[in-house]
Amino acid sequence: MPQLDTSTWFITIISMILALFMLFQSKIANHSYYSNPSHKDMKPTTHSTPWEKKWTKIYLPLSLPLH
């Protein structure tokens, strides 16, 4: 069984890490960030649903046992 030649693994791994580093640096450098992000006023919205104004069984108190 032939021996696995691992002599080129070091330079391959180092060059791969360097290439990935350069790729991510160029992606981050081209990304535009907002210089001063401002807070957007969020007003709470109220939804009018038909079951809010109705008296349904789920809103009734626990009923007493029948006598």
UniProtKB/Swiss-Prot annotation:
The keyword Ion transport applies. The modification N6-succinyllysine is found at K54. It is found in: Mitochondrion membrane. The chain crosses the membrane at residues 8-24. It is a single-pass membrane protein. The modification N6-acetyllysine is found at K54, K57. GO terms for biological process: proton motive force-driven ATP synthesis. GO terms for cellular component: mitochondrial membrane; proton-transporting ATP synthase complex. It comes from the Eukaryota. InterPro entries: ATP8_mammal, ATP8_metazoa. GO terms for molecular function: proton transmembrane transporter activity. Keywords: Acetylation, ATP synthesis, CF(0), Hydrogen ion transport, Ion transport, Membrane, Mitochondrion, Transmembrane, Transmembrane helix, Transport. Belongs to the ATPase protein 8 family. PANTHER family: ATP SYNTHASE PROTEIN 8 (PTHR13722:SF0). Mitochondrial membrane ATP synthase (F(1)F(0) ATP synthase or Complex V) produces ATP from ADP in the presence of a proton gradient across the membrane which is generated by electron transport complexes of the respiratory chain. F-type ATPases consist of two structural domains, F(1) - containing the extramembraneous catalytic core and F(0) - containing the membrane proton channel, linked together by a central stalk and a peripheral stalk. During catalysis, ATP synthesis in the catalytic domain of F(1) is coupled via a rotary mechanism of the central stalk subunits to proton translocation. F-type ATPases have 2 components, CF(1) - the catalytic core - and CF(0) - the membrane proton channel. Component of an ATP synthase complex composed of ATP5PB, ATP5MC1, ATP5F1E, ATP5PD, ATP5ME, ATP5PF, ATP5MF, MT-ATP6, MT-ATP8, ATP5F1A, ATP5F1B, ATP5F1D, ATP5F1C, ATP5PO, ATP5MG, ATP5MK and ATP5MJ. Interacts with PRICKLE3. This is ATP synthase protein 8. It comes from Sciurus vulgaris (Eurasian red squirrel). The lineage of its organism: Eukaryota, Metazoa, Chordata, Craniata, Vertebrata.
